[in-house]
UniProtKB/Swiss-Prot annotation:
Note: Heme 1 (or BL or b562) is low-potential and absorbs at about 562 nm, and heme 2 (or BH or b566) is high-potential and absorbs at about 566 nm.
Names of the cofactor(s): heme b
Effect the entry attributes to changing I369T: In strain: Isolate TK 43176
Protein name: Cytochrome b
Organism, as annotated: Glossophaga morenoi (Mexican long-tongued bat)
Binding positions (heme b b566): H97, H196
Effect of P253Q: In strain: Isolate TK 20579
Oligomeric form and interacting partners: The cytochrome bc1 complex contains 11 subunits: 3 respiratory subunits (MT-CYB, CYC1 and UQCRFS1), 2 core proteins (UQCRC1 and UQCRC2) and 6 low-molecular weight proteins (UQCRH/QCR6, UQCRB/QCR7, UQCRQ/QCR8, UQCR10/QCR9, UQCR11/QCR10 and a cleavage product of UQCRFS1). This cytochrome bc1 complex then forms a dimer.
Binding positions for heme b b562 per the UniProt entry: H83, H182
Length: 379
């Protein structure tokens, strides 16, 4: 008798994706982040659902409803901080997942890579809208500043901003629609994840060597299921420690003050995971130029597959490219630091230099170094 998991119409889809899936035998821990992102998404949807049961999306009561969740709802504070810090974990895993893709040349699977970029934008939009919901000072002013960037679009900019706001300023209509979209988007993300996996399973996984591994495959279960579960335990332990010991470590103290349109905070800044893009935005003195640079800082990933000039797929055996990759990581950390600093000397010039180096490294240095390595290897 054939196993039910191989014959049942629904179970055989699960079986071919998570049980009998042939996987390369050499996958390192860097391949754990995809499944960790799945866990993050599940945690965010579940905690978000329970938070939505107690939250009110009205400017008069939004801030108080979050306070009520933390003080009066059973374990409401756990839900709230799991959701807030879960977002940070989500982005840590996202950036490491993208970094893995860049390092090991996974971007050559262009369909999977492009859906991944779409997912990155969707998650960023979701996180931005979620940050507005507690209706604290940084929520209000962050929403005002970031949505206002759309006014840089020629001709339709101003009308577009007012259309998004639902009025002439960030107000009740804005908060209500942001709540609606913040609730909807994670399900769109979940659907995109399915497409992401569909394209990935068409080609099969890449591996650290970048060499086709068709001759050396092992079943996903039990080898990688147990490896993924270990990853889940490590990540959930880290998240629990963050939530229970220092839940406000990554937040902004200004967000514990109710939104006040008459009082601007001294430094308006987004959550830490957007600071690198915010630094690139601020480093350009022109509004439209800044907005374009902001979008391109993520969209540049879409042209990385076209700039792959190396004869090897992975950076595993390319020491010069490895140096350049870690240089790029250092630039991104510098930009993250600059994004949280005030707009004054020397931070402005450091931000401008780091922004230029960020684009130069991806668009110019990496392709050139790859060509140089080809010549050194006499290929």
């Amino acid at each position: 008798m054939t196993n039910i998991r191989k014959t049942h119409p629904l179970l055989k889809i699960v079986n071919s994706s998570f049980v009998d899936l042939p996987a390369p035998s050499s996958l390192s821990s860097w391949w754990n982040f995809g499944s960790l992102l799945g866990v993050c998404l599940a945690v965010q949807i579940l905690t978000g659902l329970f938070l939505a049961m107690h939250y009110t999306s009205d400017t008069a009561t939004a801030f108080d409803s979050v306070t009520h969740i933390c003080r009066d709802v059973n374990y409401g504070w756990v839900l709230r901080y799991l959701h807030a810090n879960g977002a940070s974990m989500f982005f840590i895993c996202l950036y490491l997942h993208v970094g893995r893709g860049l390092y090991y040349g996974s971007y050559t699977y262009s369909e999977t890579w492009n859906i991944g970029i779409l997912l990155l934008f969707a998650v960023m939009a979701t996180a931005f809208m979620g940050y507005v919901l507690p209706w604290g000072q940084m929520s209000f002013w962050g929403a005002t500043v970031i949505t206002n960037l759309l006014s840089a679009i020629p001709y339709i900019g101003t009308e577009l901003v007012q259309w998004i706001w639902g009025g002439f300023s960030v107000d009740k209509a804005t908060l209500t629609r942001f709540f609606a979209f913040h609730f909807l988007f994670p399900f769109i993300v979940a659907a995109l994840v399915m497409v992401h996996l569909l394209f990935l399973h068409e080609t099969g996984s890449n591996n650290p060597t970048g060499i086709p591994s068709d001759s050396d495959m092992i079943p996903f279960h039990p080898y990688y299921t147990i490896k993924d579960i270990l990853g889940f335990l490590i990540m959930l332990t880290a998240l629990s420690a963050l939530v229970l010991f220092s839940p406000d470590l990554l937040g902004d103290p200004d967000n514990y003050m109710p939104a006040n349109p008459l009082n601007t905070p001294p430094h308006i800044k987004p959550e830490w995971y957007f600071l690198f893009a915010y630094a690139i935005l601020r480093s350009i003195p022109n509004k439209l130029g800044g907005v374009l640079a902001l979008v391109l800082s993520i969209l540049v990933l879409a042209i990385v597959p076209m700039l792959h000039t190396s004869k090897q797929r992975s950076m595993m055996f390319r020491p010069l490219s490895q140096c350049l990759f870690w240089f790029l990581v250092a630039i991104l950390l510098t930009l993250t630091w600059i994004g949280g600093q005030p707009v004054e000397y020397p931070y402005v010039i450091i931000g401008q230099m780091a922004s230029v180096l960020y684009f130069l490294t991806i668009l110019v240095f990496m392709p050139l170094i790859s060509i140089m390595e080809n010549h050194l290897l006499k290929w």
